[in-house]
Design a protein with these regions (language model features):
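Beta-rich carbohydrate-recognition and catalytic domains
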Residues: 1-10, 19-67, 76-186, 190-196
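Charged, often glycine-rich, active-site loop that binds/positions anionic groups
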Residues: 71-72
Length: 196
């Protein structure tokens, strides 16, 4: 909830939801300043009653220096809750050096452990990873093109190597002939057998 009178938030956006061990997790970007500035933080709240009520906000990553960490997606797999969050640096311009970072929930402490940068090159995750028939996972998102001298922010996917969630290969999806490149390509994928 955007409540500058109580939590100081000037901006919240990008809810990611996941069920994990009977609890509902919600992540979102939170900023007391403007969107896409270094004060952006990744926050999480947890519900034990299916979303009727929520626990207090927990900071997954507040960044440091010019690093802002924002919204992303979850994956509950093999007993572990992963989070893949969009992040950026913001000292030279609004935001650049965009990338995705991974986090794992420590069930004992209920804190999030950073696993570092997992997809570089402007990739921002927008959909939870889906497992493909070859055993690899595909995560849909977009590639912020400004840092690469390109117009537009085209749809993109990141593909894992099996269950290794610490290294993803990013592929930008080019626009069809005749379609302008000036798009905001938030994307999603549907996996049906060997078809994506």
């Amino acid at each position: 909830k955007h409540r500058p009178d109580s939590d100081g938030a000037n901006w919240t956006l990008g809810v990611g939801l996941a069920w994990h061990k009977g609890r509902l997790y919600a992540s979102y970007g939170f900023n007391k300043g403007a969107e896409n500035t270094p004060t952006e933080e990744a926050h999480v709240r947890v519900s034990d009653d299916g979303g009727n009520s929520w626990g207090p906000p927990v900071v997954m990553d507040a960044g440091e220096g010019d690093l802002g960490v924002s919204h992303g997606v979850f994956l509950s797999h093999a007993g572990t809750l992963w989070a893949f969050m969009g992040a950026f640096h913001a000292h030279e311009k609004l935001y650049h050096r965009v990338h995705a970072r991974a986090y794992v929930l420590d069930e004992g402490s209920k804190k999030w452990a950073s696993r570092g940068v997992i997809a570089d090159g402007g990739f921002w995750p927008m959909q939870e990873p889906q497992q493909m028939s070859d055993g690899n996972w595909i995560m849909a998102g977009l590639r912020i093109g400004g840092g690469f001298g390109e117009a537009g922010n085209l749809p993109a996917v990141a593909i894992s190597k099996g269950d290794d969630f610490l290294s993803w290969e990013v592929t930008v999806i080019p626009p069809a002939a005749g379609v302008r490149r000036n798009v905001w390509g938030e994307s999603t994928v549907i996996v049906e057998g060997c078809r994506v």
